[in-house]
Amino acid sequence: MANIRVFTFNMRTDAACDGRNAFSAERSAYIEKEFPKYEADVIGFQETRPEMRQWVIDHFPAYTVCGIGREADLQGESNIIAYRTDRFDLVSLDTFWLSDTPQRPGSRFATDQSSCPRICTVVTLRCKENGRLFRHYNTHLDHVGAFAQAQGISLILNRMVSDYQTWQMPVILTGDFNVTPESKVYATVNGFDGCGDALVDVSADVGFTFHAYQPEKTQEKIDYIFTNIPADPTKSMKATDNEDGIYLSDHYPVGAIVSLD
């Protein structure tokens, strides 16, 4: 049995308005210093701009980084997936847009969506320890439109069903969903059984994840790890590190340990 430590990590785009917490100010160095102690095997990132993607490649050489930007020119923010090269082989990689034309770069839903295109990055990985395959879907749902959120997650789940009919392998879904556990989107995903065993929110016990650099005031649970791979939710975790007001992000990275046999 291979235990795999999976994380979802909204890295927060580089924004000067964050002051010392801007990625290009003090935060990137803090991530490099603190995040490795969590020994993540697979990480689904959100809000990684091209320079941040390159930073991950340069500063975390033990990982292979996959994914493209969400804009029409394949630049802009991405939902990259990083996996430990010594533990996994890449079998397949894809990106699709959350829109009525998911293969058209930069596309988005025509109504009730922000100006931001939204994407889902998908990798199939083979575990070197036991040869088992699994698929990892990583996304960032819209932060404005409830319709776009609902349509986006429906598109992802339909894709998972289609993929399962071809691949018949277990799945992991990570991301910043921009909705709370009381939402219809959450209810749609948690317990979804269209791709084999039902999806379970193995991050359910970690508490709030979005804090906007002020956790004493802002507390929202919007970051999730769903999977149908066996896992113990009580062993899930979130990275609450901060040092003199510097955080890993305005979201807490969230992790879970799944057991692939």
Descriptions of predicted regions:
Residues 1-59, 70-77, 260-261:
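N-terminal, active-site-proximal structural segment of metallo-dependent hydrolase catalytic domains
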Residues 3-18, 91-96, 122, 132-142:
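Active-site-proximal beta-strand elements of phosphoester/diester hydrolases
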Residues 4, 41-42, 134, 170-172, ...:
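Short, Asp-centered acidic motifs that coordinate Mg2+ and/or phosphate
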Residues 6, 10, 31, 82, ...:
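Generic structural signal for small/hydrophobic residues in well-ordered secondary structure
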Residues 8-27, 98-115, 145:
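Acidic/histidine-rich helix-loop elements
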Residues 12, 49, 140-142, 177-180, ...:
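Catalytic metal-binding/acid-base residues of hydrolase active sites
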Residues 42-133:
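Structured beta-strand-rich core segments of catalytic domains in phosphoester-bond hydrolases
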Residues 147, 151, 161-171, 178-261:
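Metal-dependent phosphoester-hydrolase catalytic domains
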